[in-house]
Amino acid sequence: MEKALELDGEYPESLRDEFNIPTFKSMGLSSDDKPVTYLCGNSLGLMPKSTRNSINAELDAWSDCAVESHFKHPEEARGKVPWVSIDLPILPLLAPIVGAQENEVAVMNSLTANLNSLLITFYKPTEKRFKILFEKGSFPSDYYAFYNQCKIHGISEPENVFIQIEPREGETYIRTQDILDTIEVNQDELALVCLSGVQYYTGQYFDIGRITSFAHQFPDILVGWDLAHAVGNVPLQLHDWGVDFACWCSYKYLNAGPGGIGGLFVHSKHTKPDPAKESLPRLAGWWGNDPAKRFQMLEVFEPIPGALGFRQSNPSVIDTVALRSSLELFAKFNGINEVRKRSLLLTNYMTELLEASKYYKHPLRIEKLPCFFTILTPTSTDEEHGAQLSLYFDSDTGKEDIMPKVFQYLHDHGVIGDARRPNVIRLAPAPLYNTFSDVYIAVNALNEAMDKL
């Protein structure tokens, strides 16, 4: 604990006081009001204290002025925005986090809804070019979206469309070179590459720039990314990397609350106005129409140039201001690059502690252990992971239910992580509010849990 306290003194820069940290009492663990050790920001980020006031201001506007708040907010003098434009102030806050131009991002819908919307535009299978490359074990919602997009296009056996890449036998994450080789081998049939920026189960951070650039050597292959576990976690350069499209949620590292509003990116190369070309086909709605004509109720769709033209309906005011509250904290922390610096310090410290555990089984450790854990996440370089480490629990002697027992012990002792059955616990220190002491407490509790098995 001494080193953790030293590190907290050496690197005190966090915004912990800006967040509501659950306590043992509030979570029903004990009568103690001390905060729990929350390492679950990869699943649901904590609530910024400013969020409550932001939401209450909109509830007051609804209560006091009702429909007129769409065009004249009662708190405009204090910086509040009429509802008709509620999402627009978010764009300059969000664009730097994903490395985009402001006109390339929009907030709308939720992650899978946005993925489906983008697939309608960018997945255009032909007789010869129809395959989709994504990772085996991707988040199931992505699989469902790909599968049913194939059905929409009349493909009776979507499984024949999918190229699902996975780690080599005996390895826990996918080699970048294997992805590139798979793209090259299938270059004549691939229509779309759509991977996760950070893999939700293993925590692997894919080399987005390199993979995108390589795939674009073959001019008819488009590249999209599911950034659910990447946005707010690692720096991104979507515009400079030439990514065609991307989508994400906002309730993990962006701390916008459960079911928070989603986001999407469409590269400007696809949306530049060109009188000689029709605009991209899309799932359209009135909120993507030219705002100067939106309320004329014309039966003519003139999409707003850029990502805003992909909006369909007016966004939830409550969800939007909740996201803005958190994005303002990213700006207060001086941006995603500073967030990433602190994130690496925290996660690398956690790696150090875990690898020092007597229960950690290094790949070269050959003795039989009744219970042990390994780290699925690649950690040899900083470029291979984000905040999350995925721990895989097992036994060489047939001991069962190790992970559930460890997870329950952690929870009962106020260490909040995330279990993925049958054998994985994910821990992710969030740099905006977690401390080095949090990391120490979590790993110490993990060792205690395994002592009791």
Swiss-Prot record:
GO MF annotation terms: kynureninase activity; pyridoxal phosphate binding
Gene3D superfamilies per UniProt: Aspartate Aminotransferase, domain 1, Type I PLP-dependent aspartate aminotransferase-like (Major domain)
Assembly and oligomerization: Homodimer.
Pathway info: Amino-acid degradation; L-kynurenine degradation; L-alanine and anthranilate from L-kynurenine: step 1/1; Cofactor biosynthesis; NAD(+) biosynthesis; quinolinate from L-kynurenine: step 2/3
Signal peptide residue numbers: none
SUPFAM superfamilies: PLP-dependent transferases
Residues recorded as bearing N6-(pyridoxal phosphate)lysine in the entry: 252
Subcellular location: Cytoplasm; Nucleus
Catalytic activity: L-kynurenine + H2O = anthranilate + L-alanine + H(+); 3-hydroxy-L-kynurenine + H2O = 3-hydroxyanthranilate + L-alanine + H(+)
Function: Catalyzes the cleavage of L-kynurenine (L-Kyn) and L-3-hydroxykynurenine (L-3OHKyn) into anthranilic acid (AA) and 3-hydroxyanthranilic acid (3-OHAA), respectively.
Any GO BP annotation: 'de novo' NAD biosynthetic process from L-tryptophan
Record: residues binding pyridoxal 5'-phosphate: 111-112, 139-142, 196, 226, 229, 251, 286, 314
Keywords, ordered alphabetically: Cytoplasm, Hydrolase, Nucleus, Pyridine nucleotide biosynthesis, Pyridoxal phosphate
Cofactor: pyridoxal 5'-phosphate
This protein's name: Kynureninase
Enzyme Commission number(s) from the entry: 3.7.1.3
GO CC list: cytoplasm; nucleus
InterPro entries in alphabetical order: Kynureninase, PyrdxlP-dep_Trfase, PyrdxlP-dep_Trfase_major, PyrdxlP-dep_Trfase_small
Family: Belongs to the kynureninase family.
Superkingdom of source: Eukaryota
PANTHER family, per the entry: KYNURENINASE
Misc: Present with 3060 molecules/cell in log phase SD medium.
